[in-house]
Amino acid sequence: MKVVTVGELMVRLQPFNYERFVQANSLEFTFGGGEANVAVSLANYGLDAAFVTKLPAHAIGQAAVNSLRRYGVDTSMITRGGDRVGIYYNEKGASQRGSVCIYDRANSAIQLAQPSDFDWDKIFEGVDWFHFTGITPALGANVVEICLEACKAAKAHGVKISCDLNYRGKLWTREQAREAMTKLCEYVDVCISNEEDAKDVFGIEAEATDIYGGKLNAEGYKSVAKQLADKFHFEKVAITLRESHNASENGWSAMLYDVASNEYCFSKKYELKIIDRVGGGDSFGGGLIYALLNGKSTQDAVEFAVAASALKHTIEGDYNMMTVSEVEKLAGGDGSGRIQR
């Protein structure tokens, strides 16, 4: 089974040891990006996963490519050109101090890319699944067009399409997001959202919910999922449910709605002690795609995806380094964290 994802792979610069930007003397240099993170998860699970983007032909662009290759991601369809690799600065929060993310991605290679840079008919030959997020079209009108052409080609090739709404207010307005994502979601089969994105992008929200106070009305998300499915004729809608007690401790669960069976399945809830939250949603997406491609039931699929994401929260960096057996062990109820000898 082959999966293709498209998006921006960025340099991630982060102070060491929970330092603030204003006190840091050095920064850790790694790579990450929503759809690239999903591709790494799937490659670690043993699937044929390819990532599509545009990166400069210089050494930093090559380092970005190499960061994917080391985990087995197919990088052969990455277009080379342009001058910049996008950057994001990440200041990790702790306790009552929230994390801070600052973007420096203007004029990156993918932001300036054109639809003609990608041969989607060739890219989707023999592909089973295509994934993108709402972060990528937020880069500009030209990238919206790239995503639209990708979705149209994927449909023409009979490829399943998933999208994580992933609204980023630092990249575009709600009005811009709604206009673009309305067009793109017409092609989507599986939608992933969270307690904020459905509201920010489409104005759909759960009642009696206070995400910052750690209060979620799980039943209210049935209505959110159904409204999303009815609006765009999705086959499935996944809603991740995060209870933010503080920056270091979150409650984490999810719901998966299967339209054909009218089945709403809620996962077990994990109480997380967070090492690194970045990439947590992407690891959920990767877990869900893997589970659905492997024919897991609605309940088993959401349990696998949530367990994968719970484990990612224990790992530094954007990428999820867990194996299928490790995820299945947690999904099956073994969360003891005991030493394996």
Task: Give residue ranges: language-model regions.
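Positively charged, low-complexity intrinsically disordered leader regions
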Residues: 1-20
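Alpha-helix C-terminal capping segments
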Residues: 30, 38-48, 291-294
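Conserved post-catalytic alpha-helical subdomain immediately downstream of the catalytic base
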Residues: 264-334
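Conserved phosphate/ATP/ADP-binding segment of small-molecule kinases
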Residues: 171-260
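A short helix->loop->beta-strand "cap" motif at the edges of active sites that frequently abuts
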Residues: 155-160, 232-235
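Beta-barrel outer-membrane channel/assembly domains of diderm bacteria
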Residues: 9-15, 37-44
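Conserved N-terminal subdomain of the carbohydrate kinase-like
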Residues: 48-137, 327-341
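Short catalytic helix/loop segments, enriched in acidic residues and glycine
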Residues: 20-39
